[in-house]
Amino acid sequence: MKLKIFMLAFFTGFVFVFSAAAIFVYRYSATDKKAPAEAESSSPEIYAESETLLLIFEEDGAAGPFTLVCFDPQNGRIPVLTFPAAAVFESLPDMPAAAKVYKELSHSEFAAATEKELGIAVSGWFIWNRNTCETVMAKAGSFDYILPESLFYSDGERYIDLSAGVQSITGKKFYDLVTYPDFDEISRCDVTSRLISSFFGRRVRRFLPEGSALSSSVYSSTENSVDAFSRAELRGAVKALCAEKTPISSHVTCDLDEGKDGELYFSAVTRERIKKYFTAEKNE
């Protein structure tokens, strides 16, 4: 009798312990399976969409060049492309040059025309000038840039003397390079794009702190279309971009085809580059 009672108690206890262990394993296995999803949902910046800005150089009534900067978290890069005021917008009636389109439209309408012409989405536009160069660089600090050749200019009003080799770029030097009088439009676009690419490659992390002095200097020294909501989205893209490793900032060459009367058209190669670097697709 005692043996039967002992066996019954032992069997009952075994079933209880086994059931408890099974429930424990099931519950914690389910938790483990859900962990990645929960981790993903708690880090929305990983999935931040790319943000493309249109930077418009404007001073003394003249505009251009025009620069596209894309903050692309999915591919970990910041491509920069600059096109001249003479570039033709083939998607518009009479195919006007960018300078004419800009003159006849509002800033936001020009951004929309750029979207249509190049097949991209522009998140916001910024108007920058000499004051922007000096104000932003005063907060960002100078950065090194390799100048391939010496540049000299003097006309009684302006004096520019930059030696070939490594230059420490200040606000004045930034402005002098972008507006160097003896550059043709293609050379000006190339230098502008490389300067802006170098700037973001070296200084993008300084935009990360909430209300950073660098961000404030950009917004205060420019006319722009970026409201509080857009600023939050832009900051989210930059935060995601810098989350794991230093993003690659690169100059994207803007090749132009010359028409019979000297018009400059975006080449097929350039349009392919824009499609590759300024759209939201992830490159495997």
Go through the PLM ranges and name each one.
Residues K2-L81, V269, F278:
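Entry/capping segment at the start of metal-dependent catalytic domains
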Residues P65, H107-E115, G119, R130-E134, ...:
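Extracytoplasmic/secreted envelope proteins and their assembly/folding machinery
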Residues A138-L214:
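Flexible, polar/acidic helix-loop-strand segments at domain edges
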Residues I46-E49, D60-A62, K103-S108, F126-R130, ...:
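Solvent-exposed, acidic/flexible segments
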